[in-house]
Amino acid sequence: MEFQHELIIPNEGLPFKVFLFEGGNGNYVREKHWHTSIEIFAVMEGHLEFFMNKEEYPLKAGEQLIINSNEIHSIHAAERNKTVVLQIPLKQFENYFTAQRFIRFRSQDAEADGKLASLIKKLYKVYTARDTGYEFGTMSLFYEIMYMLVKNYRLTEAHEK
């Protein structure tokens, strides 16, 4: 079975893409697909169902999910929701790749996940408000998110064995 490759194009002038996903008017389905970017969904309102590696991951407000590069996944939104999506091209992490030239992340404890979700929501708000100096605020939050991902979420080769 062939799955669709989704090409991720960063927001203009930024090394990532951030946007609000609302699941249409409900009954939204995104069929199985993959991309080379890291993708994080932070649910603000409502709920979503993700399917990844034959596992179901239901998410509700306040929860998040990290989708690694090349992971085949699909999404079902039975109702409208508000979810901030952050897509980070893999090349942003190249200084932290494993010996196999790859990087993977895994969710942590609820406290760390809550902080990461909060940073992603704040990043979206600063970016969309576009107040004076928003570019600095946006990049500052992005680097804080990157730092958290690499420091607390990255799987090393020792973790994977």
Predicted regions and their residues:
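Amphipathic alpha-helical segments enriched in hydrophobic/aromatic residues interleaved with Lys/Arg
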Residues: 100-160
